[in-house]
Amino acid sequence: MSKKSLTKELASCSFCGRTEEAVEKLISGPNVYICDKCVRLCTGILDKKAPSTYEFKILKPKEIKEKLDEYIIGQENAKKTISVGVYNHYKRIRSKNKEADGIEFSKSNVLLFGPTGSGKTLIAKTLASILDVPFTIADATTLTEAGYVGEDVENIILRLLQAADYDVAKAEQGIIYIDEIDKINRTTANVSITRDVSGEGVQQALLKIVEGTIANVPPKGGRKHPNQEYIKVNTENILFIVGGAFVNLEKIIAKRLGRNTIGFDGSNREVVDPTQKSLLLSKVEPEDLIQFGMIPEFVGRFNSIANCNELQLPDLINILTEPKNAFIKQFIAMFEAEGVKLQFTEDALAAIAQQAIEAGTGARALRLILENLMRELMYEIPSDETISEILIEKETVTEKKPPIIKRHDQKIA
């Protein structure tokens, strides 16, 4: 038998030892062989994600606020407060020695309060986008403590985990925004001897994950069951931002300060001056939130507390036109894509903003008002190629008067 045929006879995988006859393919190299089965095995190993060492952005407070300014009009104090709080939070994570000289840095969770549509949720969303970290929103009113019908607090962590594509390390540095936090207040500031399923009990349930714990998260959500497998998530470095309207909080602050907040109009109705209200809310203390019905331990987990003021007419007009993704800019771009130039008069913008104020939902109402205003045009424009320009006037907003339309080779009339 020749040397060449002997070599072929004895050829086998250098990794598993299988002979050429036992495999489909045997790939040869200089004095080495690998079979198709080992190639597939190696490919599978390489395809597996290595443990995440997710690196997040860490921006200085001024840099964070500058980016928030691009999308959020007004709320200067809230933006500064949250910028400092977020910077300190992520600086704490980045620090290699969190307990230098025996000093332990606490979490900088943030509590935002203010009326509906004042920008609380938008601030949190924009922040997550700026920092490029996983983000999720939860509604506090759907949460119940363990053992009651409703949503477990661990499901909030699950949604963050899903936003991070189940990358645990990435989720552990994400942001969770819990809205309507004021709706889980105690009905009285005194400790109740009865069980408060959706109030104090939920605050107690949230305490651990907010301050930092190893949460056992059901991978498919729902209630926990014995013998169920869990994903362990450390919440120590998750930034929690909570928000709520905290209606009439200014009255609690005024009482503490010995001031009167209420006036009366000609019809003997209560009137609260917006400037006075804003000034009072800027003087909020943890004890005011406790008096409102939040438990002391929960309030104590939030080092940064900021007020989002009620938006006034000039604010709403600016929100329509100024931010990077302003609603008016979006509609102008949509019409431009159809070859139509869309314009609004200043009076029209003011009328839209005034309708939002009357709706009582702040900036949230702006998009709906615009959608209703522009719906018929958005329906007709794609089928009418003769239109070149559209001008929206105040009367179009307030009286449903048709807008001024210019067609190709025609003047606006």
UniProtKB/Swiss-Prot annotation:
UniProt: Zn(2+) binding residues: 13, 16, 35, 38
One Gene Ontology MF term: ATP binding
InterPro entries the UniProt entry points to: AAA+_ATPase, ATP-dep_Clp_protease_ClpX, ATPase_AAA_core, Clp_ATPase_C, Clp_protease_ATP-bd_su_ClpX, ClpX_bact, P-loop_NTPase, Znf_CppX_C4
GO term, biological process aspect, one: cell division
Parts of the chain that traverse the membrane: none
Keywords: ATP-binding, Chaperone, Metal-binding, Nucleotide-binding, Zinc
Domain ClpX-type ZB span(s) in chain numbering: 1-54
Binding site for ATP: 115-122
One cellular-component annotation, GO: HslUV protease complex
Stored Pfam families: AAA_2, ClpB_D2-small, zf-C4_ClpX
Function noted in UniProt: ATP-dependent specificity component of the Clp protease. It directs the protease to specific substrates. Can perform chaperone functions in the absence of ClpP.
Protein family according to the UniProt entry: Belongs to the ClpX chaperone family.
Subunit record text: Component of the ClpX-ClpP complex. Forms a hexameric ring that, in the presence of ATP, binds to fourteen ClpP subunits assembled into a disk-like structure with a central cavity, resembling the structure of eukaryotic proteasomes.
Designated name of the protein: ATP-dependent Clp protease ATP-binding subunit ClpX
Species name: Protochlamydia amoebophila (strain UWE25)
